[in-house]
From Swiss-Prot:
This is Virginiamycin B lyase. It comes from Bacillus licheniformis (strain ATCC 14580 / DSM 13 / JCM 2505 / CCUG 7422 / NBRC 12200 / NCIMB 9375 / NCTC 10341 / NRRL NRS-1264 / Gibson 46). Its cofactor is Mg(2+). Substrate binds at H227. The active site is at H269 (proton acceptor).
Length: 295
């Protein structure tokens, strides 16, 4: 398989692009963690930016909601943000002390998020009502969250070295990983019905079935520090290697390929699938990257 990699410079090179998602209309939305903005990139490379009302909000993960709008976390401000396709931003304040990070749409028309500081999973209803669910173990540091094929929300617990699952009713299950200090971060639903996740400390990609069976795959590059992961339209999983400045691809059979990013010290974080032949990723160095898959 051949690929072509393209990079787009954001207006402020110090803005720190972090999270990224692709809308149904093909437009790419991303957070600027240091620039305190939400950016929108068209397929032709034009970028529009929208300033977040709260200063130094710490915008992190962004995702599409069931309502067609974009939802993002503000971990420093303790808020959940929503932005319309036209750029109108609404913020929802969480209970004091919250530090939301991961966010995903559930099957119940609500947005679910992880609270790293409160060690809990939160639910924000379409009417703005907030419900919180404490995790069994304190200090778990829940990170990314995604909806699984079973309708539940699955999330990584970075400090406890485990994968968590929560139902729409708030029932929580935990699945310890073989290495307690593996540091799981990103997680996504795979094309095989399983959940795939990154292990930033163990330098591995993990897979867990909805019944809890775990498999792990070691990365070829040492100290790659895999971060985010997304299911591509080509039937494989794509992930960022924050420490190595590479984008990785793993098939459902566990075959891994790595692609170096042209820009040095790119520090890739978020990643998302576009069309069947494109993958987009955010580089903290001030760029948005695109992989075009050429069969």
């Amino acid at each position: 398989m051949q690929i072509r990699m393209t990079e787009y410079q954001v207006p402020d090179p110090e803005s720190g692009p972090y999270g990224i998602t692709v809308c149904a209309n093909g437009r790419i939305w991303f957070t600027e963690q240091k620039g305190n903005r939400i950016g929108m990139l068209t397929e032709s490379g034009d970028i529009t930016e929208y300033t977040i009302p709260t200063e130094s909000a710490g915008a992190s993960i962004i995702t599409s909601g069931i309502d067609g709008e974009l939802w993002f976390t503000e971990y420093k401000a303790g808020k959940i943000g929503k932005i319309t396709p036209q750029g109108k931003i609404t913020e929802y304040a969480l209970p004091p002390g919250a530090a939301p990070f991961g966010i995903a749409a559930g099957c119940d028309d609500a947005m679910w998020y992880t609270d790293m500081a409160g060690h809990q999973i939160g639910r924000l209803s379409s009417s703005g009502e907030i419900t919180e669910y404490k995790l069994p173990k304190p200090g778990a540091f829940p990170s990314f969250i995604t909806r699984g094929a079973d309708g539940a929300l699955w999330f990584t617990q970075n400090q406890s070295g485990s994968i968590g699952r929560i139902t729409a009713d708030g029932d929580i299950s935990e699945y310890p990983l073989p290495q307690e200090q593996s540091g799981p971060v990103g997680i996504t639903a795979g094309p095989d019905g399983a959940l795939w996740f990154t292990e930033i400390n163990a330098n591995q990609i993990g897979r867990i079935t909805v019944s809890g069976k775990i498999s792990e795959y070691q990365l070829p590059t040492a100290h790659a520090r895999p971060h985010a992961i997304a299911a591509g339209g080509d039937g494989a999983l794509w992930f960022t290697e924050w420490g190595a400045g590479q984008i990785g691809r793993i098939t459902v059979d566990g075959d891994i390929t790595e692609y170096p990013i042209p820009t040095a010290d790119s520090e890739p974080h978020g990643i998302a699938a576009g069309s069947a032949h494109s993958i987009w990723f955010a580089e903290e160095c001030g760029r948005i990257g695109k992989i075009s898959i050429q069969n």
